[in-house]
Amino acid sequence: MHNTFTHTKNNTHTKNNTQAKNSGSQTKSNAVSLNKPRKLTEADVTPESIFYQRRKVLQALGITAATLALPASAQADLLAWFKGNEPPKAPSGKPLTFTPSAAYHPDLALTPEDKVTGYNNFYEFGLDKADPAANAGTLKTEDWQIKIDGDVVKPMTLDMDYLMKCFPLEERIYRLRCVEAWSMVVPWIGFELGKLLKLAEPTSNARYVAFQTLYAPDQMPGQKNRFIGGGLDYPYVEGLRLDEAMHPLAFMVVGVYGKTLPPQNGAPLRLMTPWKYGFKSIKSIVHIRLTRDQPPTTWNLSAPNEYGFYANVNPHVDHPRWSQATERVIGSGGILDVKRQPTLLFNGYAEQVASLYRGLDLRKNF
C-alpha cells in the first residue's frame, strides 16, 4: 500500500489511500565519410508522410470536388486554416526569478528570441515553422496539472504553482539540434528532470520514463484534423531510459529568455534533452509514467526506419533522406543568410553523456 498525493494551487496536500539506466565508446564500425551534403529540398527535410499530407491538403483546396468530399467539419477546419482566420493571441510571458548557470555554455551566441519563438515544430498547431506561433494562442495553460504514476512509490498530481515553488529555477544555455539538420542556442529556464522524478520515488521495476503531451483537439487544431496535424496519431508521446532521465542534463523547462514559455514553445512545461534530436524534447507535458518496458514514441511509430527511440545527435549516422554531418544555424539573418557548421557527436555533450551508451551500437540504436 502507498499514498497518492495531490498538490493543488494553495499547496495543500490531499492524501488518499490507493494500490498502488569517463567517456563511453560506441561499437566500432566502418568509418563514415563526411562528404559535403547535397542541397536539401522541402521533401528532404520534411518527414515523408508529412510532405505528402501537405501536398494532399493543397491539392484538395485546389479541386472543388475533393474539398466537398471531405466531412463538413474537416472542410471548415481546412478553410479556416488557409484563409488566415486568426486564433486568439497568446498572452505575454511572465518574468521569472532564476539563477543563471555558469556551467552551461554562457559563452555561446544566443539565437535571437524572435527566431526561438517564431520558428518551431509543434504539429498540434500546424506543419509550417510559423504555424505554432500563429495558432498556439488557443492553448489554455491555466490550472495545468502533471500526473506522475506507474512504477513509483508515491504517485502524484502536481500543479504548476507547486512546481515553480518546489524547485529553484536556473537558466541553462543549451544547444538545440533538430533532426531536420538545423540548430539554435537557447537560454532555457527550469529544473532537472531527475529532481522531479525523485519526488515520486521510482521503484526497482522502473527502467523507462514515458511522457505524454496534452490531448485537447478543441485547443490544438492538428489533433482535431489529421491534415493539419500531419497524419500523426495523438496525443504525442515520448520516452527515455530511466538513467537518461536522471542525468543532470535532462531539464524540465518552464521558461525561455527570462519569461514563462510561450505556447508555441511548449508551455507551460516541456522537456529538454540537449544531446538528442529536438523531437525527443516533448512539449506541453501532462503525464509522466515510469515503466518497466520501453514506451512507444510518436515519431518512431510513424516512421520507424527514420526515427529511432534513442535519437542521439550523431553526425556519423545519416537520416535515410539527408546527411546529419552538418547543420544550418538559425541566426539573425534571413533565408539567404545561411550558415552551416559541423554537427558534434551528442550535440557537443559527449563528455557528459557518452558513458550512458557504452557498448551500445549507435548505428543500430539510432
UniProtKB/Swiss-Prot annotation:
<keyword id="KW-0500">Molybdenum</keyword>
<keyword id="KW-0732">Signal</keyword>
<protein>
    <recommendedName>
        <fullName>Protein-methionine-sulfoxide reductase catalytic subunit MsrP</fullName>
        <ecNumber>1.8.5.-</ecNumber>
    </recommendedName>
</protein>
<dbReference type="GO" id="GO:0046872">
    <property type="term" value="F:metal ion binding"/>
</dbReference>
<dbReference type="GO" id="GO:0043546">
    <property type="term" value="F:molybdopterin cofactor binding"/>
</dbReference>
<feature type="binding site">
    <location>
        <position position="270"/>
    </location>
    <ligand>
        <name>Mo-molybdopterin</name>
    </ligand>
</feature>
<feature type="binding site">
    <location>
        <position position="120"/>
    </location>
    <ligand>
        <name>Mo-molybdopterin</name>
    </ligand>
</feature>
<feature type="binding site">
    <location>
        <position position="213"/>
    </location>
    <ligand>
        <name>Mo-molybdopterin</name>
    </ligand>
</feature>
<dbReference type="GO" id="GO:0030091">
    <property type="term" value="P:protein repair"/>
</dbReference>
<comment type="similarity">
    <text>Belongs to the MsrP family.</text>
</comment>
<dbReference type="InterPro" id="IPR000572">
    <property type="entry name" value="OxRdtase_Mopterin-bd_dom"/>
</dbReference>
<dbReference type="GO" id="GO:0016672">
    <property type="term" value="F:oxidoreductase activity, acting on a sulfur group of donors, quinone or similar compound as acceptor"/>
</dbReference>
<feature type="compositionally biased region" description="Low complexity">
    <location>
        <begin position="1"/>
        <end position="22"/>
    </location>
</feature>
<dbReference type="Pfam" id="PF00174">
    <property type="entry name" value="Oxidored_molyb"/>
</dbReference>
<comment type="subunit">
    <text>Heterodimer of a catalytic subunit (MsrP) and a heme-binding subunit (MsrQ).</text>
</comment>
<feature type="region of interest" description="Disordered">
    <location>
        <begin position="1"/>
        <end position="40"/>
    </location>
</feature>
<feature type="binding site">
    <location>
        <begin position="123"/>
        <end position="124"/>
    </location>
    <ligand>
        <name>Mo-molybdopterin</name>
    </ligand>
</feature>
<feature type="signal peptide" description="Tat-type signal">
    <location>
        <begin position="1"/>
        <end position="76"/>
    </location>
</feature>
<keyword id="KW-0560">Oxidoreductase</keyword>
<feature type="binding site">
    <location>
        <position position="178"/>
    </location>
    <ligand>
        <name>Mo-molybdopterin</name>
    </ligand>
</feature>
<dbReference type="GO" id="GO:0042597">
    <property type="term" value="C:periplasmic space"/>
</dbReference>
<keyword id="KW-0479">Metal-binding</keyword>
<dbReference type="InterPro" id="IPR022867">
    <property type="entry name" value="MsrP"/>
</dbReference>
<feature type="binding site">
    <location>
        <position position="265"/>
    </location>
    <ligand>
        <name>Mo-molybdopterin</name>
    </ligand>
</feature>
<keyword id="KW-0574">Periplasm</keyword>
<feature type="compositionally biased region" description="Polar residues">
    <location>
        <begin position="23"/>
        <end position="33"/>
    </location>
</feature>
<dbReference type="InterPro" id="IPR036374">
    <property type="entry name" value="OxRdtase_Mopterin-bd_sf"/>
</dbReference>
<comment type="function">
    <text>Part of the MsrPQ system that repairs oxidized periplasmic proteins containing methionine sulfoxide residues (Met-O), using respiratory chain electrons. Thus protects these proteins from oxidative-stress damage caused by reactive species of oxygen and chlorine generated by the host defense mechanisms. MsrPQ is essential for the maintenance of envelope integrity under bleach stress, rescuing a wide series of structurally unrelated periplasmic proteins from methionine oxidation.</text>
</comment>
<feature type="binding site">
    <location>
        <begin position="281"/>
        <end position="283"/>
    </location>
    <ligand>
        <name>Mo-molybdopterin</name>
    </ligand>
</feature>
